[in-house]
């Protein structure tokens, strides 16, 4: 059986990247929450 996780930088950035997060209200909330928590990495 094929493993489910087949890493791809392109797909990773397109689905979880910073610009994608900034596009929606919910995504911006995620970034804001991570900033408030003091995360070094806000998005992938």
From Swiss-Prot:
Presence of the UniProt keyword RNA-binding in the record: no
Pfam families: Ribosomal_L34 (PF00468)
MF annotations from Gene Ontology: structural constituent of ribosome
Leader peptide range in chain numbering: none
InterPro entries: Ribosomal_bL34 (IPR000271), Ribosomal_bL34_CS (IPR020939)
Keywords on record: Ribonucleoprotein, Ribosomal protein
Biological process according to GO: translation
GO cellular component: ribonucleoprotein complex; ribosome
Stated family: Belongs to the bacterial ribosomal protein bL34 family.
Protein name, as recorded: Large ribosomal subunit protein bL34
Species assigned in the record: Dechloromonas aromatica (strain RCB)
């Amino acid at each position: 059986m094929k493993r489910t996780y087949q890493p791809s930088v392109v797909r990773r950035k397109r689905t979880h990247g910073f610009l994608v997060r900034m596009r929606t209200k919910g995504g911006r909330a995620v970034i804001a929450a991570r900033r408030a928590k003091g995360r070094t990495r806000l998005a992938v």
